[in-house]
């Protein structure tokens, strides 16, 4: 934000506080904080935010957002998840054939980069945990100001498939597109069928 935008925000916080509002909730974007490389955290934006809130006796409800901002209804801000993540996971896990293993792949063959597919949870979970731990440690001195912490997972922060997002047909409403065509999703389906019926 520019200095003018910070000043405008401070005035809005003052007005809200006078009206009796005691806390505000903001997204805390994983890609903004850890976007440059794994384990390198830049909390400067959120440090300034928390200091501003504290000056106005306003509490904070951070939403740890592990998805992309932008590309959905009413989005006016763009922030990807950490782009290094895709290459890092491929480097550490040679059994993964390509980035498509980690992404939702639709029936039309399109992929979504806004969130790591649920079929790749075991690969990305250590990075989620690391980020949550880093958040906890960094803001330990502000716990009196934090009323609760929310996790925002899945496309647009909703635990759902990206079945009607812009990477596919892009219009809403429609029936949506199936998102179960990544190699990991297909392996999971085969495993399920074999366990249930003993053969494919």
Regions picked out by a protein language model, each given a short descriptive name:
Residues 2-3, 33-36, 158, 163:
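Generic alpha-helix signal with a bias toward terminal, lower-confidence helices
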Residues 1-7, 120:
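Active-site mouth loops of central-metabolism enzymes
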Residues 87-200:
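Polysaccharide-binding and catalytic clefts of secreted carbohydrate-active enzymes
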Residues 6-101, 125-143, 147:
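Aromatic-lined substrate-binding rim segments of carbohydrate-active enzymes
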Residues 1, 67, 154-156:
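Generic structural motif
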């Amino acid at each position: 934000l520019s200095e003018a935008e910070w000043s405008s925000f401070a005035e809005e916080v003052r007005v809200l506080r006078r009206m009796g509002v005691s806390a505000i909730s903001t997204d805390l974007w994983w890609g903004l904080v850890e976007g440059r490389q794994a384990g390198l955290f830049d909390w400067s934006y959120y440090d300034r935010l928390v200091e501003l809130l504290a000056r106005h006796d306003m509490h904070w409800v951070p939403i740890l957002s592990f998805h992309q901002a932008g590309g959905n209804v009413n989005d006016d801000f763009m922030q990807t998840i950490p782009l290094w993540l895709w290459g890092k996971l491929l480097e550490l896990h040679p059994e993964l054939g390509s980035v498509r293993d980690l992404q939702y792949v639709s029936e039309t063959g399109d992929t979504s980069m806004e969130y790591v597919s649920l079929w790749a949870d075991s690969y990305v979970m250590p990075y989620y945990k690391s980020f949550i731990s880093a958040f906890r440690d960094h803001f330990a001195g502000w716990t009196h100001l934090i009323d609760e912490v929310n996790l925002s997972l899945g496309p647009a922060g909703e635990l759902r498939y990206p079945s009607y997002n812009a990477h596919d047909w892009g219009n809403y409403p429609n029936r949506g597109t199936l998102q179960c065509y990544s190699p990991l999703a297909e392996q999971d389906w085969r495993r399920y069928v074999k366990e249930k019926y003993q053969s494919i």
